[in-house]
């Protein structure tokens, strides 16, 4: 089961989130049938989104949009405070690797663009914040967003590793943030540790990667686990929701769908679930719309 562990240094100067998102990203790959680079790009976005949502309370929802002008197109993800996330990538078929090493490439094919975060607190007035893409690798772009937009110095590591058949092997990451009151000596110590820590890929490949991430972040410093919560890919779409959307089209357009198309098929962008509305379904919707 996927999970996120929240922790804080005993000094109260640093907090860290570590995540195992393997099943989440695996489910996304299966639903969208993404190829290698698209899988990694979408997976990193889902992980970043789960970190941001874990910072919220109540019934808030956080949308992340990674908007590039190159191969991937847009990547859209939505997460809630209960650990659920859904998302999609416009171009599912990007499959580019380094010839010598087989490393899956993401950044060079993201292009120029923006990292957009929309936080919906349920008040009817969502808050939107935008920062430019720095490398297109998503992890670095997320860290830049946290530092520039939320004014919280942060270190981030996110990755998705694939097996020999390009299926998700493991996915996860971490976020480390400096809290008010941290001394210069503490900051220097943590900066040095982050600079010298093994690559996120090697940590994720270790036998117990959650513990490996925590050990790499805190070293010999004491820390306290604050919480452990489950994570999952979950889409809240339903036939009823799409029926409500059809109701907004108007009688004329609905009648055309019924008479000319003999029904309509709608596919959810976030999870690829398809819903079919028969002529009888459309007749009912038309009748409901004129009541």
Swiss-Prot record:
GO molecular function, one term: unfolded protein binding
A Gene Ontology term for the protein's cellular component: cytoplasm
GO biological process terms on file: protein refolding
Keywords from the UniProt entry: Chaperone, Cytoplasm, Disulfide bond, Redox-active center, Zinc
Disulfide bonds: 235-237, 268-271
Database matches in CDD domains: Hsp33
Localisation: Cytoplasm
Cited Pfam families: HSP33 (PF01430)
UniProt modification remark: Under oxidizing conditions two disulfide bonds are formed involving the reactive cysteines. Under reducing conditions zinc is bound to the reactive cysteines and the protein is inactive.
Main location: cytoplasm
Protein family: Belongs to the HSP33 family.
Purpose: Redox regulated molecular chaperone. Protects both thermally unfolding and oxidatively damaged proteins from irreversible aggregation. Plays an important role in the bacterial defense system toward oxidative stress.
Name the record gives this protein: 33 kDa chaperonin
Organism from which the protein derives: Streptococcus agalactiae serotype Ia (strain ATCC 27591 / A909 / CDC SS700)
């Amino acid at each position: 089961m996927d999970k996120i562990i929240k922790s804080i240094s005993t000094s109260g100067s640093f907090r860290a989130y570590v995540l195992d998102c393997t099943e989440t990203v695996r489910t996304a790959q299966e639903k969208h049938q993404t190829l290698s680079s698209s899988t990694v790009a979408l997976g990193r976005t889902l992980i970043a989104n789960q970190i941001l949502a874990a910072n919220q309370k109540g019934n808030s929802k956080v949308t992340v949009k990674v908007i590039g002008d190159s191969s991937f197109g847009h990547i859209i993800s939505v997460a809630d405070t209960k650990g659920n996330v859904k998302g999609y990538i416009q171009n599912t078929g990007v499959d580019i690797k380094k010839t010598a090493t087989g490393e899956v490439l993401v950044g060079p094919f993201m292009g120029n663009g923006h990292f957009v975060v929309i936080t919906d607190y349920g008040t009817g007035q969502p808050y939107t914040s935008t920062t430019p893409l720095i490398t297109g690798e998503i992890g670095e772009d997320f860290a830049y967003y946290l530092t520039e937009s939320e004014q919280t110095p942060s270190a981030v590591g996110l990755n998705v590793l694939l097996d020999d058949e390009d299926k998700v092997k493991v996915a996860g990451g971490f976020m480390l943030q400096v809290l008010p009151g941290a001394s210069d000596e503490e900051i220097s110590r943590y900066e040095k540790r982050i600079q010298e820590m093994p690559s996120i890929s090697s940590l994720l490949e270790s036998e117990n990667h959650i513990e490996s991430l925590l050990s790499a972040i805190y070293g010999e410093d004491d820390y306290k686990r604050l919480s452990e919560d489950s994570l999952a890919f979950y889409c809240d779409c339903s036939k009823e929701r799409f029926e409500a959307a059809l109701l907004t089209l108007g009688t004329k357009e609905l009648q055309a769908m019924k008479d000319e198309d003999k029904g309509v098929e709608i596919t959810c962008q976030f999870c690829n679930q398809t819903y079919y509305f028969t002529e009888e379904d459309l007749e009912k919707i038309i009748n409901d719309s004129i009541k």
